[in-house]
Amino acid sequence: MATYLIGDVHGCYRELRQLLNQVNFDANQDTLWLTGDLVARGPDSLEVLRFVKSLGSALKLVLGNHDLHLLGVFAKISRNKPKDKLNELLNAPDADELINWLRRQPLLQVDEEKKIVMAHAGITPQWDLATAKKCAREVEAILSSDSYPLFINSMYGDMPNNWSPELTGLPRLRFSTNAFTRMRYCFPNGQLDMICKDKPENAPAPLKPWFDLPNQLPNDYSIIFGHWASLEGKGTPENIYALDTGCCWGGVLTCLRWEDKRYFIQPSLTHLP
Protein backbone atom coordinates (compact mmCIF):
# COMPACT_ATOMS: atom_id res chain seq x y z
CA MET A 1 0.00 0.00 0.00
CA ALA A 2 2.16 2.81 -1.32
CA THR A 3 1.43 6.51 -1.76
CA TYR A 4 2.60 8.00 -5.05
CA LEU A 5 2.63 11.77 -5.61
CA ILE A 6 2.97 13.02 -9.19
CA GLY A 7 3.41 16.56 -10.50
CA ASP A 8 1.45 18.43 -13.17
CA VAL A 9 0.40 16.02 -15.94
CA HIS A 10 -0.81 18.63 -18.47
CA GLY A 11 -2.31 16.13 -20.87
CA CYS A 12 0.80 13.92 -20.95
CA TYR A 13 -1.10 10.64 -20.83
CA ARG A 14 1.61 8.34 -22.19
CA GLU A 15 4.13 9.63 -19.69
CA LEU A 16 1.68 9.21 -16.81
CA ARG A 17 0.94 5.60 -17.71
CA GLN A 18 4.61 4.76 -18.22
CA LEU A 19 5.53 6.34 -14.89
CA LEU A 20 2.82 4.36 -13.11
CA ASN A 21 4.01 1.18 -14.82
CA GLN A 22 7.55 1.95 -13.69
CA VAL A 23 6.46 1.96 -10.03
CA ASN A 24 4.03 -0.96 -10.48
CA PHE A 25 1.11 1.18 -9.35
CA ASP A 26 -1.87 -0.93 -8.28
CA ALA A 27 -5.12 1.01 -7.95
CA ASN A 28 -6.54 -1.74 -5.75
CA GLN A 29 -4.06 -1.06 -2.98
CA ASP A 30 -1.98 2.06 -3.77
CA THR A 31 -2.98 5.74 -3.72
CA LEU A 32 -2.15 8.29 -6.40
CA TRP A 33 -1.91 11.98 -5.51
CA LEU A 34 -1.86 14.50 -8.39
CA THR A 35 -0.87 18.16 -7.95
CA GLY A 36 -3.41 19.50 -10.49
CA ASP A 37 -3.21 20.89 -14.01
CA LEU A 38 -4.29 17.56 -15.41
CA VAL A 39 -5.18 19.17 -18.71
CA ALA A 40 -3.91 21.59 -21.38
CA ARG A 41 -0.65 22.08 -23.29
CA GLY A 42 0.05 18.35 -23.66
CA PRO A 43 -1.59 16.24 -26.39
CA ASP A 44 -3.94 13.92 -24.49
CA SER A 45 -6.06 15.82 -21.95
CA LEU A 46 -9.09 13.65 -22.79
CA GLU A 47 -7.30 10.38 -22.04
CA VAL A 48 -5.81 11.79 -18.85
CA LEU A 49 -9.23 12.74 -17.50
CA ARG A 50 -10.79 9.42 -18.49
CA PHE A 51 -8.00 7.51 -16.81
CA VAL A 52 -7.77 9.42 -13.55
CA LYS A 53 -11.56 9.44 -13.16
CA SER A 54 -11.52 5.65 -13.52
CA LEU A 55 -9.22 5.34 -10.49
CA GLY A 56 -12.05 6.16 -8.09
CA SER A 57 -11.03 6.10 -4.44
CA ALA A 58 -7.38 5.37 -5.33
CA LEU A 59 -7.06 8.98 -6.53
CA LYS A 60 -6.44 12.17 -4.58
CA LEU A 61 -6.12 15.27 -6.73
CA VAL A 62 -6.35 19.03 -6.46
CA LEU A 63 -7.46 21.47 -9.13
CA GLY A 64 -4.92 23.70 -10.84
CA ASN A 65 -5.30 26.94 -12.76
CA HIS A 66 -5.45 25.13 -16.11
CA ASP A 67 -8.21 22.86 -14.80
CA LEU A 68 -10.18 25.94 -13.76
CA HIS A 69 -9.55 27.49 -17.19
CA LEU A 70 -11.04 24.36 -18.77
CA LEU A 71 -14.18 24.87 -16.68
CA GLY A 72 -14.35 28.41 -18.01
CA VAL A 73 -13.97 27.27 -21.62
CA PHE A 74 -16.62 24.58 -21.09
CA ALA A 75 -19.01 27.20 -19.69
CA LYS A 76 -18.25 29.42 -22.73
CA ILE A 77 -16.76 32.13 -20.51
CA SER A 78 -13.04 31.71 -21.19
CA ARG A 79 -11.38 31.60 -24.61
CA ASN A 80 -10.34 28.24 -25.99
CA LYS A 81 -6.68 28.82 -26.86
CA PRO A 82 -5.27 26.53 -29.59
CA LYS A 83 -2.03 26.05 -27.59
CA ASP A 84 -4.04 24.34 -24.83
CA LYS A 85 -5.05 21.49 -27.19
CA LEU A 86 -8.47 21.05 -25.56
CA ASN A 87 -10.65 20.50 -28.65
CA GLU A 88 -10.59 16.70 -28.53
CA LEU A 89 -11.73 16.81 -24.91
CA LEU A 90 -14.38 19.47 -25.44
CA ASN A 91 -15.84 17.58 -28.42
CA ALA A 92 -15.78 14.14 -26.79
CA PRO A 93 -19.11 12.36 -26.18
CA ASP A 94 -18.29 12.12 -22.47
CA ALA A 95 -17.07 15.73 -22.12
CA ASP A 96 -20.02 16.76 -19.94
CA GLU A 97 -19.49 13.82 -17.59
CA LEU A 98 -15.73 14.35 -17.31
CA ILE A 99 -15.81 18.10 -16.82
CA ASN A 100 -18.66 18.00 -14.33
CA TRP A 101 -16.68 15.38 -12.40
CA LEU A 102 -13.60 17.61 -12.54
CA ARG A 103 -15.35 20.66 -11.12
CA ARG A 104 -16.35 18.64 -8.05
CA GLN A 105 -12.73 17.90 -7.15
CA PRO A 106 -10.99 19.72 -4.27
CA LEU A 107 -8.47 22.55 -4.14
CA LEU A 108 -6.81 21.13 -1.03
CA GLN A 109 -5.95 17.63 0.15
CA VAL A 110 -4.95 16.96 3.75
CA ASP A 111 -3.90 13.59 5.15
CA GLU A 112 -3.72 13.97 8.92
CA GLU A 113 -2.20 10.52 9.38
CA LYS A 114 0.62 11.00 6.88
CA LYS A 115 0.88 14.75 7.71
CA ILE A 116 0.62 15.74 4.05
CA VAL A 117 -0.96 18.92 2.69
CA MET A 118 -1.29 19.28 -1.08
CA ALA A 119 -2.40 22.29 -3.13
CA HIS A 120 -1.56 23.11 -6.74
CA ALA A 121 0.43 26.30 -6.08
CA GLY A 122 1.09 25.81 -2.35
CA ILE A 123 -0.19 27.31 0.91
CA THR A 124 0.03 31.05 1.44
CA PRO A 125 2.08 32.03 4.52
CA GLN A 126 -0.91 34.13 5.63
CA TRP A 127 -3.03 31.03 6.37
CA ASP A 128 -2.95 28.45 9.10
CA LEU A 129 -4.24 24.97 8.26
CA ALA A 130 -7.75 25.62 9.56
CA THR A 131 -8.07 28.75 7.42
CA ALA A 132 -6.75 26.93 4.35
CA LYS A 133 -9.34 24.19 4.84
CA LYS A 134 -12.15 26.69 5.29
CA CYS A 135 -11.19 28.74 2.23
CA ALA A 136 -10.86 25.61 0.10
CA ARG A 137 -14.33 24.42 1.11
CA GLU A 138 -15.82 27.79 0.17
CA VAL A 139 -14.42 27.72 -3.37
CA GLU A 140 -15.22 24.02 -3.78
CA ALA A 141 -18.84 24.67 -2.81
CA ILE A 142 -19.35 27.26 -5.54
CA LEU A 143 -17.47 25.23 -8.18
CA SER A 144 -19.63 22.19 -7.53
CA SER A 145 -22.87 24.20 -7.64
CA ASP A 146 -25.01 25.01 -10.68
CA SER A 147 -23.98 28.66 -10.38
CA TYR A 148 -20.28 27.92 -10.98
CA PRO A 149 -20.23 29.90 -14.29
CA LEU A 150 -20.99 33.08 -12.35
CA PHE A 151 -17.93 32.47 -10.20
CA ILE A 152 -15.71 31.54 -13.15
CA ASN A 153 -16.72 34.80 -14.83
CA SER A 154 -15.48 36.74 -11.78
CA MET A 155 -12.52 34.51 -10.92
CA TYR A 156 -9.90 36.20 -13.09
CA GLY A 157 -7.96 39.07 -11.60
CA ASP A 158 -5.00 39.71 -9.30
CA MET A 159 -6.81 41.57 -6.53
CA PRO A 160 -7.26 41.37 -3.64
CA ASN A 161 -3.74 40.10 -3.00
CA ASN A 162 -3.64 40.45 0.78
CA TRP A 163 -5.53 38.08 3.06
CA SER A 164 -7.95 39.34 5.66
CA PRO A 165 -10.57 37.33 7.56
CA GLU A 166 -12.86 40.26 6.78
CA LEU A 167 -12.84 39.48 3.05
CA THR A 168 -16.24 38.32 1.83
CA GLY A 169 -18.02 37.35 -1.37
CA LEU A 170 -16.23 37.25 -4.71
CA PRO A 171 -13.08 39.07 -3.51
CA ARG A 172 -12.58 36.39 -0.84
CA LEU A 173 -13.16 33.58 -3.34
CA ARG A 174 -10.79 35.18 -5.85
CA PHE A 175 -8.02 35.55 -3.27
CA SER A 176 -8.41 31.91 -2.25
CA THR A 177 -8.40 30.71 -5.85
CA ASN A 178 -5.25 32.69 -6.62
CA ALA A 179 -3.52 31.43 -3.48
CA PHE A 180 -4.34 27.80 -4.20
CA THR A 181 -3.76 27.78 -7.97
CA ARG A 182 -1.60 30.73 -9.15
CA MET A 183 0.71 31.83 -6.32
CA ARG A 184 4.49 31.89 -6.74
CA TYR A 185 5.92 34.92 -4.97
CA CYS A 186 5.01 36.90 -1.87
CA PHE A 187 6.11 40.16 -0.34
CA PRO A 188 7.78 39.86 3.10
CA ASN A 189 4.41 40.38 4.83
CA GLY A 190 2.92 37.42 2.93
CA GLN A 191 0.98 39.54 0.45
CA LEU A 192 0.72 37.80 -2.93
CA ASP A 193 2.56 39.02 -6.01
CA MET A 194 0.67 37.77 -9.05
CA ILE A 195 3.01 39.20 -11.70
CA CYS A 196 6.51 37.72 -11.37
CA LYS A 197 7.03 34.28 -12.96
CA ASP A 198 10.83 34.29 -13.10
CA LYS A 199 13.10 31.79 -11.43
CA PRO A 200 13.87 32.78 -7.81
CA GLU A 201 17.40 33.93 -8.66
CA ASN A 202 15.94 36.45 -11.12
CA ALA A 203 13.06 37.73 -9.00
CA PRO A 204 13.19 41.41 -8.01
CA ALA A 205 13.54 42.40 -4.36
CA PRO A 206 11.74 42.21 -2.01
CA LEU A 207 9.82 39.27 -3.51
CA LYS A 208 10.42 35.80 -2.12
CA PRO A 209 9.05 32.41 -3.14
CA TRP A 210 6.06 31.69 -0.90
CA PHE A 211 7.87 28.66 0.56
CA ASP A 212 10.81 30.78 1.76
CA LEU A 213 8.57 32.69 4.17
CA PRO A 214 7.63 31.17 7.54
CA ASN A 215 4.36 29.25 7.23
CA GLN A 216 1.71 28.68 9.87
CA LEU A 217 1.27 24.95 9.38
CA PRO A 218 2.20 22.48 12.13
CA ASN A 219 5.92 21.73 12.03
CA ASP A 220 5.39 18.02 11.36
CA TYR A 221 3.39 18.60 8.17
CA SER A 222 4.80 18.50 4.64
CA ILE A 223 3.50 20.56 1.72
CA ILE A 224 3.23 19.09 -1.77
CA PHE A 225 2.73 21.42 -4.73
CA GLY A 226 3.13 21.67 -8.50
CA HIS A 227 2.50 24.68 -10.76
CA TRP A 228 6.06 26.06 -10.85
CA ALA A 229 7.91 24.09 -13.54
CA SER A 230 10.91 26.42 -13.72
CA LEU A 231 11.92 25.36 -10.19
CA GLU A 232 12.71 21.94 -11.68
CA GLY A 233 11.81 20.44 -8.31
CA LYS A 234 14.69 22.20 -6.55
CA GLY A 235 15.33 24.88 -3.95
CA THR A 236 12.54 24.25 -1.47
CA PRO A 237 12.84 23.66 2.30
CA GLU A 238 13.18 20.11 3.55
CA ASN A 239 9.47 19.47 4.16
CA ILE A 240 8.15 21.21 1.02
CA TYR A 241 8.14 19.25 -2.24
CA ALA A 242 7.89 20.85 -5.70
CA LEU A 243 6.76 18.17 -8.15
CA ASP A 244 6.07 20.03 -11.41
CA THR A 245 9.10 19.36 -13.60
CA GLY A 246 7.74 20.53 -16.95
CA CYS A 247 6.87 17.30 -18.72
CA CYS A 248 4.67 19.08 -21.27
CA TRP A 249 7.57 21.44 -22.09
CA GLY A 250 9.96 18.59 -22.83
CA GLY A 251 11.05 18.00 -19.22
CA VAL A 252 10.12 15.01 -17.10
CA LEU A 253 7.11 13.78 -15.16
CA THR A 254 8.15 13.29 -11.54
CA CYS A 255 6.78 10.84 -8.99
CA LEU A 256 7.60 10.77 -5.27
CA ARG A 257 6.90 7.58 -3.35
CA TRP A 258 6.02 8.90 0.06
CA GLU A 259 6.94 5.94 2.22
CA ASP A 260 10.65 5.98 1.35
CA LYS A 261 10.86 9.45 -0.30
CA ARG A 262 12.22 7.88 -3.46
CA TYR A 263 11.84 9.76 -6.74
CA PHE A 264 10.99 8.27 -10.12
CA ILE A 265 10.95 10.14 -13.43
CA GLN A 266 9.58 9.63 -16.92
CA PRO A 267 11.08 11.81 -19.66
CA SER A 268 8.69 13.65 -21.93
CA LEU A 269 7.43 11.79 -24.99
CA THR A 270 5.39 14.75 -26.21
CA HIS A 271 7.66 15.57 -29.14
CA LEU A 272 8.20 11.93 -30.11
CA PRO A 273 5.96 9.88 -32.44
Swiss-Prot record:
Cystines in this chain: none
Note the CDD domains from the entry.
MPP_ApaH (cd07422)
Keywords, alphabetical? Hydrolase
Q: Where are the transmembrane segments?
A: none
Indicate whether Hydrolase appears among the record's keywords: yes
Q: Which InterPro entries match?
A: ApaH (IPR004617), Calcineurin-like_PHP_ApaH (IPR004843), Metallo-depent_PP-like (IPR029052)
Catalytic activity field:
P(1),P(4)-bis(5'-adenosyl) tetraphosphate + H2O = 2 ADP + 2 H(+)
What's one Pfam family here?
A: Metallophos
Quote the EC number. 3.6.1.41
Q: Does the keyword Secreted apply?
A: no
Q: Which GO terms describe its molecular function?
A: bis(5'-nucleosyl)-tetraphosphatase (symmetrical) activity
Instruction: Give, as one word, the top-level EC class.
Output: hydrolase
- Record NCBIfam families: apaH, PRK00166.1
The record, for HAMAP family, names: ApaH
Q: What does this protein do?
A: Hydrolyzes diadenosine 5',5'''-P1,P4-tetraphosphate to yield ADP.
In the record, the note on similarity to other proteins reads:
Belongs to the Ap4A hydrolase family.
- Name-wise, this protein is Bis(5'-nucleosyl)-tetraphosphatase, symmetrical
Species assigned in the record: Proteus mirabilis (strain HI4320)
